[in-house]
């Protein structure tokens, strides 16, 4: 049905999150119709991003520098850390323009079924930041899935002896993801955060 190069392109596109067979086919056919210089620019951008974008040494958000812009910004509140599962959550919260503190990206959530425990996440660096940097509040902004709740409770118990721990209020249904929430919902969730019991 497809020539081998087209079949390989479709197969690789299907590896992207949210891209099924039909979308992969549509994208592949679109790519083939574009001028070669546009395809070269796309390929170059992919390779450059992979080579130059890593993780911030402080918060583990994506960064082209050893320390990201948010962590370097002297106007950000150093005494407040918002803990999120993924860099997409940082981007979603930043769009609200409500939060003025710093972040900590865990790199996922605890999921015993998938073999992801506390050791596979950036939890120990968070504990070090809290205990060494005089952090006054940790805001847990993790999606309210079963795994997210497990992670929230674990981190809350771990950090309570050292600082105030709150979690954002959710105007989201259980099982929802932060990245799909609108800015108003996220802003209200930040405003309505509460201390963990």
UniProtKB/Swiss-Prot annotation:
HAMAP family: RecR. SMART domains: HhH1, TOPRIM. PANTHER family: RECOMBINATION PROTEIN RECR. Belongs to the RecR family. Pfam families: RecR_C, RecR_HhH, RecR_ZnF, Toprim_4. This is Recombination protein RecR. PROSITE patterns: RECR (PS01300), TOPRIM (PS50880). Residues 79-173 form the Toprim domain.
